[in-house]
Amino acid sequence: MNLLIMGLPGAGKGTQAAKIVEEFGVAHISTGDMFRAAMANQTEMGRLAKSFIDKGELVPDEVTNGIVKERLAESDIAEKGFLLDGYPRTIEQAHALDETLKALDIKLDGVINIEVNPESLVERLSGRFICRSCGSTYHKVFNPTKVEGTCDVCGGHEFFQREDDKPETVKRRLDVNIAQGEPIIAHYRELGLVSDIQGNQDIDDVFADVKKAIAAIK
């Protein structure tokens, strides 16, 4: 069984990916792991990727696509199947993946799309704040301090928010992800591969829906 998992940052995609891998025994292929392995093993594409990263440059699509192809050609994929996580990120990469799968004679069985309302994601992702004295991390909704305005760990009263966690920054990041993701989802929807999963639920309820979707695919 060969699957792709998609979802916006904060939608719980990583959590569900880990559960799918544990439950179904497929190979978990994440972009970060692929890059690290390719560079550590000094594959042709790994060496190319490292040359760009060492210069502080973005790795071009051709190299990223090549690393994915190298990974999908490994023997465990034929044995176990895969869950691809974090790729494709653009419609161009999606088309490149189509070509790679065709060249390797691999069939993509389904796309699990974790859907969460972007407004609730802004709240989820921008709620983090940090104690200036000791660095302890809290969340306005999910992990507040026991006493408002006082750090549980050191008793400090000064907190700050990282630039990346501010609502306007989070919203901009989500807007970019939505703009990139919509044509990819549309592409796979045309192929009849997408299963939409409501992500605004308890983690176990989300996974119950994921399992139902996978059972329908199988």
Swiss-Prot record:
Binding annotation for Zn(2+): C131, C134, C151, C154
Molecular-function GO terms, alphabetical: adenylate kinase activity; ATP binding; zinc ion binding
InterPro entries membership: Adenyl_kin_sub (IPR006259), Adenylat/UMP-CMP_kin (IPR000850), Adenylat_kinase_CS (IPR033690), Adenylate_kinase_lid-dom (IPR007862), P-loop_NTPase (IPR027417)
Keyword Isomerase belongs to the record: no
Source organism, top-level taxon: Bacteria
Pathway terms, separated by semicolons: Purine metabolism; AMP biosynthesis via salvage pathway; AMP from ADP: step 1/1
Record PROSITE patterns: ADENYLATE_KINASE
Region annotation LID: where it falls in the sequence: 127-165
Family recorded in the similarity comment: Belongs to the adenylate kinase family.
PANTHER family associated with the record: NUCLEOTIDE KINASE
Domain comment in the entry: Consists of three domains, a large central CORE domain and two small peripheral domains, NMPbind and LID, which undergo movements during catalysis. The LID domain closes over the site of phosphoryl transfer upon ATP binding. Assembling and dissambling the active center during each catalytic cycle provides an effective means to prevent ATP hydrolysis. Some bacteria have evolved a zinc-coordinating structure that stabilizes the LID domain.
Task performed by this protein: Catalyzes the reversible transfer of the terminal phosphate group between ATP and AMP. Plays an important role in cellular energy homeostasis and in adenine nucleotide metabolism.
Record protein name field: Adenylate kinase
